[in-house]
């Protein structure tokens, strides 16, 4: 009998619009920040809390931030550890970091749980552990405070082990299922988040006007090239 294996149950992936599939290589990145990602369930209260580095809310935030950054379509701004960043800036006699995001992501884990089932035969016994989660996210336009998109994603993962005539693996509590199911639930939303953010028109702010020269926020790191023109 083989050792227990974790099997993520992948949800149906959101359909990516033709607009996203046909986007040109020249793409201006949006500036995005994840404002919060909280655990609103009763699971793990007192241990999986915001102050814990192992909290599932913090874990969900890290996974989502990593997935969006990997898409190379956004400039991700750190918000959760802003105090640490500002402390480092102060040590170098630099001012606090004040960069506003174009869009803010607010999220929560609305459902999280586990169950264990088993089957006992004449010569065999199996044990199956299943974890499931649901996450909710909202996209907020920082300039207007308007919620422009919201969606719920879900995920499931399980591990199974068995014995035959007393031989085989004994399955204890599999804590790694918690990590896997959160990752699956977040993954079910990533395509839709990217699609909705990239469909919004890029905008910037006028920093200064000198004679007939207008200086705006943005640059090469966002994908702006020499010769690009914009509507005001």
Question: Where are these predicted regions, by residue range?
Answer:
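Active-site-adjacent mobile loop/cap segments within catalytic or ligand-binding domains
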Residues: 163-166, 171-174, 178, 189
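A structural "domain/chain start" motif
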Residues: 1-75, 81-85, 143, 151-156, ...
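Extracytoplasmic/periplasmic, Sec-exported soluble proteins
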Residues: 26, 52-60, 96-97, 101, ...
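Short, solvent-exposed, polar/charged sequence segments at loop or secondary-structure edges
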Residues: 52-57, 62, 69-122, 128, ...
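Beta-strand/loop-dominated core regions that host nucleotide or nucleotide-derived cofactor-binding catalytic loops
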Residues: 230-232
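Amphipathic beta-strand/beta-sheet edge segments enriched in Tyr/Trp
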Residues: 102-163
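Short, structured interface segments
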Residues: 177-200
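Acidic, serine/threonine- and glycine-rich low-complexity intrinsically disordered segments
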Residues: 150, 159, 164-165, 187, ...
